[in-house]
């Protein structure tokens, strides 16, 4: 019984360290690029939608997921996150979103809009 508790504790510790919900800890030091190991993350690529695709009253935007370079670390991170490669739909959720084209957070009433 004592060995069972030790094994379950070690398995839980390994699962928490590998889980993306607590941050992908890559190698020694942890974090994104904070150590000696590889950076593990799942990359999403936005595919433009046809029709009006601006604002909250718009068609959903398609998202395609892929690992970084198809490496084993990215595959393990995607597997742990239960994200399968394919096409995803993103529906509008009221929050702040960063957009590289605009250079500021949506929701702030300043700056020149790019669209």
Swiss-Prot record:
Gene Ontology molecular function: structural constituent of egg chorion
Entry keyword set: Secreted, Signal
Presence of keyword Secreted: yes
Cell compartments where the protein resides: Secreted
Short name of any one Pfam family annotated for the protein: Chorion_2
GO biological process: chorion-containing eggshell formation
One cellular-component annotation, GO: egg chorion
Signal peptide: 1-18
Similarity section: Belongs to the chorion protein S15/S18 family.
Function in brief: Chorion membrane (egg shell) protein; plays a role in protecting the egg from the environment.
Descriptive protein name: Chorion protein S15
Organism, scientific name: Drosophila melanogaster
Underlying gene: Cp15
């Amino acid at each position: 019984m004592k060995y069972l508790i030790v094994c379950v504790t070690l398995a839980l510790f390994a699962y928490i360290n590998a889980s993306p919900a607590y941050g992908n800890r890559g190698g020694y030091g942890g974090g994104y690029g904070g150590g000696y190991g590889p950076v593990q993350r799942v990359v999403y690529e936005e595919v433009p939608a046809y029709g009006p695709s601006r604002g909250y009253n718009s068609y959903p935007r398609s998202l395609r997921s892929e690992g970084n370079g198809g490496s084993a670390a990215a595959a393990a991170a995607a597997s742990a996150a239960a994200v399968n490669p394919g096409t995803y739909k993103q529906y509008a959720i009221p929050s702040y979103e960063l957009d590289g084209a605009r250079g500021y957070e949506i929701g702030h009433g300043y700056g020149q809009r790019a669209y």
